[in-house]
Amino acid sequence: MPTIQQLVRKGRESFADKSKSPALNSCPQRRGVCVRVYTTTPKKPNSAMRKVARVRLTNSKEVNAYIPGEGHNLQEHSIVLVRGGRVKDLPGVRYHIVRGTLDTAGVNGRTQRRSKYGAKRPKPGQAPAAKGKK
């Protein structure tokens, strides 16, 4: 344990917080190109086919990014906008793709939380879009 005199001379060393999305280089979002679009399964208690894309960012780093919402139009060479935010049950996926920007279409038929999924406001008086897959 240091003496008060040692603390006066040297002080305590403070540790800087580590970034949770280091590939973005302190930027809120980054543009990138899809290298591979695929599905993967989540960790143990959960079961699904989660849609994920491998994206090469403009700073030439490659990351795995989650594609939120139901259905998407992404394929290889699509230009996407990537934001931070991990997916808890997918190890190694620490980024999200922003829906409704660049080559990524918004989610069709979405009426609630539309801004999160890039969905346009439905016309007033219009019948709600059909739910489910046909």
From Swiss-Prot:
Signal peptide: none annotated. GO terms for molecular function: rRNA binding; structural constituent of ribosome; tRNA binding. Residues 111-123 have a biased composition (Basic residues). Residues 10-20 have a biased composition (Basic and acidic residues). The modification 3-methylthioaspartic acid is found at D89. GO terms for cellular component: small ribosomal subunit. Residues 124-134 have a biased composition (Low complexity). Residues 1-26, 103-134 are annotated as: Disordered. Keywords: Methylation, Ribonucleoprotein, Ribosomal protein, RNA-binding, rRNA-binding, tRNA-binding. SUPFAM superfamilies: Nucleic acid-binding proteins. CDD domains: Ribosomal_S12 (cd03368). InterPro entries: NA-bd_OB-fold (IPR012340), Ribosomal_uS12 (IPR006032), Ribosomal_uS12_bac (IPR005679). With S4 and S5 plays an important role in translational accuracy. Interacts with and stabilizes bases of the 16S rRNA that are involved in tRNA selection in the A site and with the mRNA backbone. Located at the interface of the 30S and 50S subunits, it traverses the body of the 30S subunit contacting proteins on the other side and probably holding the rRNA structure together. The combined cluster of proteins S8, S12 and S17 appears to hold together the shoulder and platform of the 30S subunit. HAMAP family: Ribosomal_uS12_B. Part of the 30S ribosomal subunit. Contacts proteins S8 and S17. May interact with IF1 in the 30S initiation complex. Belongs to the universal ribosomal protein uS12 family. This is Small ribosomal subunit protein uS12. It comes from Porphyromonas gingivalis (strain ATCC BAA-308 / W83).
